[in-house]
Regions:
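Short, charged/polar low-complexity linear motifs in solvent-exposed/disordered segments
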Residues: 42-44, 85, 107
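N-terminal beta-alpha supersecondary unit
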Residues: 1-63
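Oxyanion-binding and handling regions
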Residues: 1-20, 31-34, 88-217
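Short glycine/serine- and small hydrophobic-enriched flexible loop segments
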Residues: 41-42, 77, 81, 179-183
């Protein structure tokens, strides 16, 4: 199995290739100067694989940078249209908590991601050596709410230290996405059109009512 992971939900973009157990990852922060396909070519070269050998593509669905997530989904959809490839979306929150587990954090750990407008996406897990269990589902909290919990909480996430200096900076990575996919006993692949960013806010626009003006004769 050759799995390509694409994680663009945070300021640290990454792609990773797991080719028959050989893993390579390319990361880029901030400027995003390297096109996604250039990053993919890099990991293909490092694993001595070809594009044609990629049979599975995993996408980080966020929440996070809506533009980045949309770009990753568009890449996956285009790849599926061009050839026979299986697609799977995984929450970037799950990738972050998996990395927190790898870094041996234990107890209650909250993933905190910037949601703009002085708000944050937040989900809490109980983490032990054996794994992690969600105890507070992903939801949106205000800055004041997050600050009120900061003294006793273990906060992790991309850019978390901008608001909470005691937090642990942890980014979701494409390598972690591939590991999470391989660890699943059942994988429910989806057609490209079913991949959607995780976005908890209601739609910001309202459809205009039909015009009441009489039609022109």
């Amino acid at each position: 199995m050759t799995i390509l992971g694409v994680e663009f939900s945070s300021p640290q973009r990454s792609v990773a290739l797991n080719h028959n157990g050989v893993v390579a990852e390319a990361r880029e922060e901030g400027g995003r100067h390297t096109p996604a396909l250039g990053m993919i070519e890099k990991v293909l070269a490092e694993t001595a694989a070809t594009r044609q050998e990629i049979d599975t593509l995993i996408v980080g669905l966020g929440p996070g940078s809506y533009t980045g997530i949309r770009a990753a989904i568009a890449l996956a959809q285009g790849w599926q249209l061009a050839g026979d490839i299986k697609l799977l979306g995984i929450s970037s929150v799950e990738a972050i908590i998996a990395r927190a587990h790898e870094e041996q954090l234990t107890g209650q750990v909250s993933v905190v991601i910037d949601a703009q407008r002085q708000e944050f996406y937040l989900a809490t897990y109980e983490v032990s050596a054996a794994g992690w269990t969600e105890i507070e589902p992903l939801h949106i909290v205000t800055l004041a709410e997050a600050q009120s919990r900061a003294a006793t909480a273990q906060y992790v996430g991309p850019e978390v230290t901008r608001w909470f200096p005691a937090g642990r900076l942890i980014f979701p990575t494409a390598t972690t996405l591939t590991h999470l996919a391989l660890a699943r006993t059942r994988i429910h692949f989806v057609p490209g059109e079913q991949l959607e960013p995780i976005y908890l806010r209601e739609t910001a626009f309202v459809k205009a009512p039909p015009s009441r003006l009489p039609k022109a004769l």
